[in-house]
Amino acid sequence: MNKPVHNNEHRRKRFNKKCPFVSAGWKTIDYKDTETLKKFITERGKILPRRITGVSSRFQGTLTLAIKRARHIGLLPFVAED
């Protein structure tokens, strides 16, 4: 009978994340820039999703490709180093 009018406890505030590559004016992502690529990889070696990083869909694809290229060449590890 006594239901709360608004249950805001479980709602999260949404805000638009700006793509770091668009705001910095990047045209492409270089696979040799390992310091930038490491920011978008977890400590386990997984690529972070767009909803966490805020990267646009265009740059998420190029970022994924750059990370995979860097892994195949040996610039980035495939898995975490224990």
UniProtKB/Swiss-Prot annotation:
Function: Binds as a heterodimer with protein bS6 to the central domain of the 16S rRNA, where it helps stabilize the platform of the 30S subunit.
HAMAP family attached to this UniProt entry: Ribosomal_bS18
Subunit structure, as described in the record: Part of the 30S ribosomal subunit. Forms a tight heterodimer with protein bS6.
Protein name: Small ribosomal subunit protein bS18
Keyword Ribonucleoprotein in record: yes
Gene coding for it: rpsR
GO molecular function: small ribosomal subunit rRNA binding; structural constituent of ribosome
SUPFAM superfamilies membership: Ribosomal protein S18
InterPro entries: Ribosomal_bS18, Ribosomal_bS18_CS, Ribosomal_bS18_sf
Matching Gene3D superfamilies: Ribosomal protein S18 (4.10.640.10)
PROSITE patterns registered for this protein in UniProt: RIBOSOMAL_S18
A family per Pfam: Ribosomal_S18
Family: Belongs to the bacterial ribosomal protein bS18 family.
Single biological process term from Gene Ontology: translation
GO cellular component, one term: cytosolic small ribosomal subunit
Keyword Ribonucleoprotein in annotation: yes
